[in-house]
Structures are given as structure tokens and as C-alpha cells.
């Protein structure tokens, strides 16, 4: 129910075209920022440049539109609505759903429409709280600059210098990816797919590897507080779940799996079972942290 479809449509005079259907698009990624340069016969000699950033301190993001020689009266129609699929597999983050699942329904019931004038040189669109809004130029500039400052600091925190100019940008890209899986307490399982908390996933190696030792310590402290210490192992092996063809341990406190020493998947919780046993991964990451 929280998934939204956002789309843009460009209008010049009595003609319009979806923004992703323009004749030419140059798309680039730079360590947490996407940029697009768009041209089309509909624009004549005009050029539309778009820069997109996520907010560093809230769920949301901002588009900056920069116009050059655009036709007079050009408009950008902005739409946000519910998505077509009513139910998604694993929140839709694993690519297991139909290709059109995130498209707008043919007859949206919750669609909102905004018009952005492209007569100036710069304009902004913000998405926050699952809604679009068109901020004033001063506010938009402030929000964009704040987000760009954060992005730039993250990018510059890890620098690689080699004779290969195509390899060197990986430092900033790696730092941006690492920041994307940090939720304030722990390193998440993944940034898009599997964006969930797991105590021993491989992401926890990244903190010390790129020099973010404070985040690494926060992660390990958070999960050290999730280790079970008051449930002795009273049920001997075998304790596999017959309903699952012995493929997993039966979820019952007191088994060798779910007893003292077991680390739960959510920080600061000691009462949560999960089919993974990630103790070995967590301890290996912790030892590498001590080594650093």
C-alpha cells in the first residue's frame, strides 16, 4: 500500500511526450547522484538537465530541473498514484513480480497531478511522505544543496588513486553504497533487494574496510545486545523441522540452535527466532573488527 508510481510528461504547445520517451537521454551515476541530459525534436534546440538526490536525513528525495533554450510555455506534468499490483512478493524488491507491477493502474483512484513551468532556468520537485510537492525556488535550492553537501562528503571519504581513471571513481561509489545500507544502528542485508536487518550478513565487513570504525562498533554493539543468555540448551539433537523436510531447525527455544549464544536478527532483541544461524558470520566479522 506504500508503493507509489511517479511519472513525468513534457508538454510543448499542444504536443506532449513521456519524459522517458524523449529521443535522446544521456544518463550518468556519480556516487549517490543520478543525472540526465535530455533532448528531443519537440524541444527544438532546448535541453533539459535533471539531477536527482536522496535526502540524507529523511525518507524522500529531490529532483532539480535545469532548462536551456526551452520552448516558451513548456510544462512538465508530474503524476503520483498507487501502483498496479495490489500485492507484491517481498515488498517488490526482488524482481519476482510482473514487469508492469509498478506501473500506474489504467484508471488510478489516488492519482495527483502537478504542473511545473519550465520557462525559468531552474525548478525543483520533492518527494516526501509518499507525496510530491513543488517547493519554492529558495526552499528547493536549500534542500538540494544540503543533500548534495552530504553526498559530496560521503563520496570524498574514500578516494582511490591509480593510473586507471575508470577505476578511481569506485572509491566514492563504494562509500555511497555503504552509506545506503546503514540504518543508523546496523549494516542492512542489502540496499534495495533484501533491505532488512540480519546480524551476520557480509555487509558488516564494510565499516572497517573503508574506515568507518564508529559505525562498525555501533553495529557490533547492537547485535551483542541481541545474544540470548538465559535459555539453556535442554533439547538434544536431532531438532530439524519435519514439516519442512528436515531442511531447517524446528523453531523452539531450548534446541541447540535456539538457546544460549544464539544472536537474534533485530538489534537489542533476545526473543526473536529466525531460520538463519548467522553466529559464525557475526563472530568472524567481529574478530576482523578487533584486528583493525
Indicate where each model-derived feature is located.
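Low-complexity, acidic Ser/Thr/Pro/Gly-rich terminal tails and inter-domain linkers that flank the onset
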Residues: 37-56
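Substrate-binding groove/exosite segments of carbohydrate-active enzymes
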Residues: 149-292
Amino acid at each position: 500500500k506504500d508503493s507509489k508510481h511517479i511519472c513525468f510528461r513534457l508538454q510543448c504547445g499542444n504536443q506532449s511526450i513521456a519524459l522517458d520517451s524523449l529521443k535522446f537521454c544521456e544518463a550518468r551515476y556519480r556516487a549517490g547522484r543520478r543525472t540526465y541530459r535530455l533532448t528531443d525534436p519537440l524541444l527544438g534546440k532546448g535541453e533539459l538537465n535533471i539531477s536527482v538526490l536522496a535526502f540524507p536525513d529523511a525518507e524522500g528525495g529531490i529532483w532539480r530541473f535545469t532548462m536551456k533554450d526551452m520552448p516558451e510555455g513548456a510544462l512538465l506534468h508530474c503524476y503520483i498514484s498507487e501502483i498496479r499490483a495490489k500485492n507484491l512478493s517481498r515488498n517488490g524488491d526482488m524482481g519476482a513480480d510482473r514487469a508492469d507491477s509498478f506501473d500506474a493502474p489504467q484508471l488510478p483512484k489516488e492519482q495527483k497531478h502537478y504542473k511545473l513551468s519550465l520557462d525559468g532556468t531552474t525548478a525543483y520537485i520533492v518527494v516526501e511522505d509518499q507525496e510530491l510537492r513543488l517547493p519554492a525556488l529558495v526552499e528547493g535550492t536549500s534542500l538540494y544543496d544540503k543533500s548534495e553537501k552530504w553526498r559530496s562528503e560521503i563520496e570524498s571519504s574514500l578516494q582511490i588513486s591509480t593510473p586507471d581513471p575508470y577505476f578511481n571513481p569506485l572509491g566514492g561509489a563504494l562509500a555511497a553504497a555503504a552509506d545506503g545500507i546503514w540504518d543508523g544502528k546496523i549494516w542492512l542485508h542489502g540496499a534495495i533487494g533484501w533491505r532488512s536487518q540480519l546480524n551476520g550478513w557480509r555487509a558488516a565487513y564494510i565499516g572497517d574496510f573503508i574506515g568507518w570504525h564508529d559505525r562498525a562498533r555501533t553495529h557490533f554493539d547492537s547485535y551483542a545486545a541481541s545474544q540470548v543468555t538465559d535459555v539453556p540448551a535442554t533439547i538434544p539433537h536431532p531438532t530439524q523441522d519435519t514439516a519442512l523436510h528436515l531442511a531447517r531447525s524446528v523453531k523452539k527455544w531450548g534446541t541447540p540452535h535456539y538457546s544460549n549464544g544464539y544472536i537474534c536478527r533485530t538489534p537489542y532483541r533476545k526473543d526473536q527466532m529466525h531460520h538463519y544461524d548467522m553466529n559464525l558470520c557475526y563472530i568472524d566479522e567481529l574478530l576482523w573488527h578487533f584486528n583493525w
